[in-house]
Amino acid sequence: MERNVTLDFVRGVAILGILLLNISAFGLPKAAYLNPAWYGAITPQDAWTWAFLDLIGQVKFLTLFALLFGAGLQMLLPRGRRWIQSRLTLLVLLGFIHGLLFWDGDILLAYGLVGLICWRLVRDAPSVKSLFNTGVMLYLVGLGVLMLLGLISDSQTSRAWTPDASAILYEKYWKLHGGVEAISNRADGVGNSLLALGAQYGWQLAGMMLIGAALMRSGWLKGQFSLRHYRRTGFVLVAIGVIINLPAIALQWRLDWAYRWCAFLLQMPRELSAPFQAIGYASLFYGFWPQLSRFKLVLAIACVGRMALTNYLLQTLICTTLFYHLGLFMHFDRLELLAFVIPVWLANILFSVIWLRYFRQGPVEWLWRQLTLRAAGTAISKTSR
């Protein structure tokens, strides 16, 4: 099957874009990911950086990646049940290892678990419309749960939102020293992530996967619609997303990121805007692909998309080395951390381009495929990596 280079490019953008937000999760305490005022006071530099990233990137690139993951489930259906279940089960195992031994911000475990449920929904959906509508419904259920959590939450500030000095020192200690203490804390993080997945986030993740599968089945993610359609759709959806999210950003700033309102209720506009902006971004890439495809950088980013799993893990390897093993954790603010993003992007791009000159797949993708073939009991092909 001939590869869809546009789809690879969009996936590459998603992987690179995720790092814009993850870099603060690597370089700062966990509370800083959503709360720029995690340490009490906040500088204008931090506030403006948070606002800009929240508007263009927070949740949007993860949503885009979930959309493409769902599209991949649709594309895998001809492989059959054993192949898909083996592939996703291996992803669950990889995510568990990644989250337990390397980094507490893993997304692979969640994607694998939700994928094991969603692929059957994709397979059994009688039409594109029913698949899309089910995805929208599941996503809205997740938003409803988020609203419920906000309504029942205590007005007392949580230590997870604004940790005290001892909590910050302890987090810094176990991240820099590693060992059994770090594994124990990451295990707690995996447990908390699974609880959040089952209670709230899993609904949204499943919804986006089904929407992505519907867009693939309809031909939309295959580029089968007109350039004019993609351009108009993209501009409209991005505008809608910005209009929904911008007032919430301003209100959080106005409220000084108070836990009572900002930890749950004012997260909702961002979560609601994310599908509009994520699909809008993809639509603009498809609409302007004839122009974009002329640039070598765009084709290089498509190589990153072909090796998405490898590059996601490479980001973890580089960033945990820098911030935990070399001791750069908590040495930079939110804006300064962005200076690390471009070198990591360059590493992703250069490694992908060079690797794919000699092999057909990324190293982790190749291993994943070989293990899937064995687990599914399928004859192993002799194709090159």
List the predicted regions and their residue ranges:
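Membrane-proximal cytoplasmic C-terminal regulatory module of class A 7TM GPCRs
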Residues: 360-385
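Juxtamembrane membrane-water interface segments that cap and precede transmembrane helices
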Residues: 41-53, 178-193, 256-267
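Specific transmembrane alpha-helix
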Residues: 63-78, 109-122, 200-223, 273-293
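N-terminal signal-anchor module of multipass membrane proteins
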Residues: 1-69, 76
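Long hydrophobic alpha-helical segments that form multi-pass transmembrane helix bundles
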Residues: 133-215
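Membrane-interface helix-loop-helix modules in multi-pass inner-membrane proteins
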Residues: 81-83, 90-121
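Alpha-helical transmembrane segments of multi-pass integral membrane proteins
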Residues: 205, 259-358
